[in-house]
A protein has these predicted regions:
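A short, well-ordered alpha-helix in the C-terminal region of glycosyltransferases
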Residues: 321, 470, 477-492, 504
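Non-catalytic membrane-proximal stalk/linker segments that position and tether the catalytic domains
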Residues: 1-14, 98-141, 148, 513-585
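Carbohydrate-associated surface elements
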Residues: 282, 303
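Aromatic "clamp/platform" in nucleotide-sugar-dependent glycosyltransferases that forms part
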Residues: 414
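Short alpha-helical donor nucleotide-sugar binding micro-motif in glycosyltransferases
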Residues: 393-394, 401-406
Length: 585
């Protein structure tokens, strides 16, 4: 038997023991070693022996990994995930790791060791010691708690901030708490290997324990909460256990649920937070009106990368030729997730009114979502099928080219912080017609476009159509507003200015612990229960969609999700509570 000790402390009890067969070649052993060095787990012992029943194995609390060969495709967090998969399920003797880092279901439970495959076993139920994991490093580390890794404005903000911090030398740890497709996982793992999607490997009741393990092993210098209900649920636990850890939240817009959505939770939990970062002055005033101290709320306006997002006449001509759009035709762009917040029905009604006024235009819908089917029906009802092209989600390069080929950006949202897509649309030289909501007036000046106040839908449609028509009838004003938009971004909302503002915010985060009374601090068990319900209902709805071959985004798909949530709510809280919830809403 050959025993090799790895890690900073050779005589420490290893968190994981690696078992390899005695017939492994030297080349295979080298490949296994190379794989292990890529893992986020750094404390392990390697045992090169002929069998799995060695006298050295039955050690209380030891996790054992059978590794007959080097895996080809396991993500960098696989070993730590395997340990916590087992810790979450103490009665499970074995687990098999699938060799596909792209799959969410990385683990399959086994009752016996899979012959010739990768497997792990946990002897005893001791939790990993706090010193295990990544070694201490002189670089600063951020721990980000987010709900998911999905296309959208909040996740774009998270990515932008992580990139900026990575350029400053920060190390990054990202935790996503909800069950979802996590279509942007690759974008986050491109910045850091330390990305954790909790429902992929963890039992919900262990979520708090795992968060404590991450804090103990990673030793972050700052915890950032970004639109995460779970983060607010466990905030009291975090502040009690780690009083010296600075905690900041990042919020974008007030919402109509739970007395303001996440900003409402932030206001009620302000005693437990060191700082509140918001993306608009509008949201800052909203928080101040709810009793948050002015000194704790700081505005971080976003940006567009003007080296990439800029007017380009050659691209404009190329894209229009590809789409069969005449050079002089006015092109209206509408981009984002097709959901109730973006009001696609008002987009269709406004363009229908514009068409009835005799205006000639082409509109591009750049996005997808649960209301895509309804939007198609609305476009047909308004006679716009030939004028509006639904192009679906675009990658960044394609979206930029389509923006450069467009003249007007139209966004009739029900609510926003400051829509990120406005920064990029303006940088590409588009005039803006958008809803006067949130902090839009902080970005879109009267020289760059029109902001339309909220009214009843029919009147708003006429107002939007009138603004769009005025731009189309006055080409010189349209051109001038587009130029002003691009100039405003170059002068006040660039990446370098954003990074300078972010550095200033980080320098002002206090080291001292906040004190006071939190008016909304649920116990961690409630946060775990909410996670468990969301994970279970998502999996049930997803399974039904697959069995019934139902599209992910659509009316019936949303009905299935509501039914699944109702089933688990009924099972957890009973019929009376469900009826009260239905009556309330």
């Amino acid at each position: 038997m050959k025993v090799l000790s790895r890690g900073p402390v050779a005589d420490a009890v290893p968190l994981l023991s690696i078992l390899t067969a005695c017939d492994c070649s030297v080349e295979e052993l080298e490949r296994i070693a190379a794989f292990l060095e890529t893992q986020t787990l750094k404390r392990w012992r390697w045992i090169h022996c002929p069998g799995v029943d060695s006298d050295c194995l039955p050690v209380e609390g030891m996790a054992v990994l059978y590794l007959p060969r080097a895996p080809a495709a396991l993500r960098a967090t696989a070993l730590e995930e395997a340990i916590w998969f087992l810790l979450s399920r103490p009665t499970l003797p074995w687990v098999e790791l699938r060799e596909d880092a792209r799959r969410g279901d990385l683990f399959v439970s086994r009752r016996s060791l899979p012959e010739g495959r990768i497997g792990a076993r946990l002897n005893g139920r001791r939790q990993p010691c706090s010193s295990a994991g990544l070694p201490n490093a002189p670089r600063k580390r951020l721990l980000l708690l987010a709900p998911w890794l999905e296309p959208g404005g909040a996740d774009r903000c998270n990515l932008d901030m992580l990139r900026a911090l990575a350029r400053e030398g920060w190390m990054l740890t990202v935790v996503a708490s909800l069950a979802a497709e996590h279509r942007w996982r690759d974008r986050f793992t491109a910045l850091t290997a330390d990305v954790w999607v909790l429902p992929d490997f963890l039992a919900a009741e262990k979520a708090c324990a795992f968060l404590a393990y991450l804090v103990d092993s990673r030793q972050p210098d700052l915890m950032l909460l970004s639109n995460s209900a779970f983060a607010y649920d466990v905030l009291g636990y975090v502040r009690t256990r780690y009083p010296g850890l600075p905690v900041v939240d990042l919020n974008h817009m007030e919402e109509g649920w739970d007395d303001g959505g996440h900003p409402g939770r932030a206001a009620r939990c302000t005693a437990l937070l060191d700082r509140h970062w918001v993306v608009s002055g509008h949201l800052r005033h909203w928080l101040l009106d709810r009793g948050v101290e002015a000194s704790k709320v700081e505005v971080l306006h976003w940006f567009a990368d003007v080296d990439s997002w800029k007017p380009d006449s050659l691209t404009r001509a190329k894209v229009r030729a590809r789409l069969g759009i005449a050079p002089q035709c006015v092109v209206i762009a509408y981009a984002g997730r097709l959901c109730a917040q973006k009001r696609p029905e008002l987009f269709a009604a406004s363009l229908g009114e514009l068409a009835r006024r005799g205006s000639d235009f082409v509109a591009l819908v750049l996005g997808d979502g649960e209301l895509a089917g309804e939007l198609r029906n609305d476009l047909r009802r308004h006679g716009l099928a030939g004028r509006v092209r639904m192009l679906g989600w675009q990658d960044e390069a394609e979206l930029r080219e389509l923006f450069q080929a467009s003249d007007i950006f139209f966004l009739p949202s029900a609510g926003e912080g400051i829509a990120l897509v406005l920064y990029e649309a303006m940088a590409c030289g588009m005039a803006i017609v958008a809803a006067d909501v949130g902090g839009h007036a902080e970005l879109v000046s009267a020289h760059c476009g029109f902001l339309v106040p909220r009214r009843d839908a029919e009147r708003e449609a006429r107002d939007y159509a009138a603004r769009l028509e005025s731009l189309m009838r006055e080409p010189e004003m349209l051109r001038r507003m587009g130029q002003n938009s691009a100039r405003r971004i170059r002068e006040a909302f660039t990446l370098s200015l954003f990074e300078r503002r972010l550095r200033g915010l980080l320098e002002r985060v206090p080291v001292s612990t906040p004190c006071g009374v939190c008016t909304d601090s649920p116990v961690p068990a409630l946060g775990a229960a909410r996670l468990s319900m969301q994970w279970a209902s998502y999996r049930l709805a997803n399974g039904l969609r697959c069995r019934l071959d139902i599209q992910k985004h659509g009316r019936f798909s949303r009905f299935l999700e509501r039914c699944a949530k109702g089933v688990f709510f009924l099972r957890t809280f009973g019929a009376k509570a469900l009826w009260q919830k239905i009556r309330k809403h």
